[in-house]
Amino acid sequence: MPKNSKVTQREHSNEHVTESVADLLALEEPVDYKQSVLNVAGETGGKQKVAEEELDAEDRPAWNSKLQYILAQIGFSVGLGNIWRFPYLCQKNGGGAYLVPYLVLLIIIGIPLFFLELAVGQRIRRGSIGVWHYVCPRLGGIGFSSCIVCLFVGLYYNVIIGWSVFYFFKSFQYPLPWSECPVIRNGTVAVVEPECEKSSATTYFWYREALDISNSISESGGLNWKMTVCLLVAWSIVGMAVVKGIQSSGKVMYFSSLFPYVVLACFLVRGLLLRGAVDGILHMFTPKLDKMLDPQVWREAATQVFFALGLGFGGVIAFSSYNKQDNNCHFDAALVSFINFFTSVLATLVVFAVLGFKANIMNEKCVVENAEKILGYLNSNVLSRDLIPPHVNFSHLTTKDYSEMYNVIMTVKEKQFSALGLDPCLLEDELDKSVQGTGLAFIAFTEAMTHFPASPFWSVMFFLMLINLGLGSMIGTMAGITTPIIDTFKVPKEMFTVGCCVFAFFVGLLFVQRSGNYFVTMFDDYSATLPLTVIVILENIAVAWIYGTKKFMQELTEMLGFRPYRFYFYMWKFVSPLCMAVLTTASIIQLGVSPPGYSAWIKEEAAERYLYFPNWAMALLITLIAVATLPIPVVFILRHFHLLSDGSNTLSVSYKKGRMMKDISNLEENDETRFILSKVPSEAPSPMPTHRSYLGPGSTSPLESSSHPNGRYGSGYLLASTPESEL
């Protein structure tokens, strides 16, 4: 050893030399005791190297304010599904009665599991990969599966933002380009586009002008250059929003999370002033109580709760990992969950106020068209004028008058009635036409807005709202990819984020072919549903059964400063896993009972037709599900047979102040200089409490001899235990 080394100098001095870890702990200042972390990575629960974790935790970015964090969680959880999925499910599954199973499942599944993800992210301060490796190394594949699902969802979700960008720029003109069918001129002859005439102006614009869609998924048709440019714009927006992490995305959230509520409020006020709005809202919330007994309603409600909160994606964990340790994540879970529910109900009011207005217009149009048919039959003596009630005035025909006339003709001309081709023109029939997803946003809603005064203004506002809703969700989705990868592999943040956006843009070209909409349907319906249910049920099992619900509750008590309700103990331990298992089983059965398919637009018929996926598409679909779930069994097998290190072969001690760490397994047996602390003995406080004392190889902790065999988050994180009697 060099003569001028500090060890040699101290050996020749009278200064006290620490010979062991026990002495080292005895010299720790009282203030260090509160902030120190003792990590013993033994064979039964090895964790990541703690010195690196301490450094990362101190250097980890943080939210500028609690408001910024809440807006980020709201922006991620409140997305396009709240606008076009929830209203459709509400209408389909019993109107107001659907809110009962939804609220019940939100309370017993949604909030507990959302709280769980917030808590583990905030406690461990890592992305999804680091969190689940830390809780249970053998289930570390959960984090990788979350990243893959986020990638799949981000690929097609940003395409929808691209569609909204296209409509947004097309809205800056009057009249709106989808308000009338195009006219084809051939010399002096002008005819309406046949495809548009058979369908409608908004439907034609969506399928032909925007998507230029092919007749099936097997017909690629090449790239749609307009949508390719819009996809590039969409990924550029997302890239700029997330390139600096929460420093950049947090500022974007102030606008992207709040602006949609301004637009929804404006649409609600405007919608309530429209003729027929009340009809739509009453139709929406009139409860059909018999639907509550249908298991399918509960399955769809559970699925919607599950996806509405963004469970399993990793975005919730990523956002909460930037919080302070003492943040009240229990309050955050309840607040964000109920804001999400409130947004869904608000969006439903807006949608059905507007659809009620549209239904009235379409109903009046139907009455006019059928009245013209009846006049034609009267003039050609096919029908007798005696069939027309005397008070009916064809120049001012009301829906009530038409309904009365229709019933008389149907009764008298019972045998010949079907040949007349008359429609009943019932308002209920128009309102019962279930529209969801892109059909609601890009067809039904756009058609309604063409009848608004100042329609371009409302169109600009609507599609700007969709862009912001999508952007908020994409920021969370990207965080679910970038945060765990950056935390785990220490790659440069900006370079990796930009690389992800570039990669996703080129892969996303699959969705901007002329057949791209069919691939969006495939990914939306099948790529994430089953994998996410598997991910969340394993997250629940990892915390509640492998780590231990009692220990987790105690950790929450130490972190929050109060004990969470015992309600969560039973939800995490029993109810939520059972519900998730039933949902997973139901999803698998649904895939088997209903062969996967999609709605194709047939140009020649100008109508949709349901087609089944061809064999190669089914193979792709199965591959997507397999790739998303494969990391879970792979990591489990590799770590079970010790083919992949889980960090359990090292025994390490780390200090926040001294930043001192040495791998004891690598120390020489007679090394007397292994731990030296530059403090004099007089500064040493009293010995550390038992639960903070050093555990040598083969020794037993008082905690390990109790009912907590693995310590907190495994044997590497030991804190004082709370008596079970308090649980």
Curated annotation (Swiss-Prot):
Sugar-modified residues: N186, N393
Annotated family: Belongs to the sodium:neurotransmitter symporter (SNF) (TC 2.A.22) family.
Keywords of the record: Amino-acid transport, Cell projection, Cytoplasmic vesicle, Glycoprotein, Ion transport, Membrane, Neurotransmitter transport, Phosphoprotein, Sodium, Sodium transport, Symport, Synapse, Transmembrane, Transmembrane helix, Transport
Spans traversing the lipid bilayer: 69-89, 97-116, 141-161, 225-243, 252-269, 305-322, 334-355, 452-471, 495-513, 529-549, 570-591, 619-641
Bias (Polar residues): 698-709
Species for this entry: Rattus norvegicus
Name this protein carries in UniProt: Sodium-dependent neutral amino acid transporter SLC6A17
Database matches in Pfam families: SNF
GO biological process, one term: L-leucine transport
Field pH dependence: Optimum pH is 8.5.
Region (Disordered): 680-727
Subcellular location: Cytoplasmic vesicle, Secretory vesicle, Synaptic vesicle membrane; Postsynapse; Presynapse
NCBIfam families: Na_transp
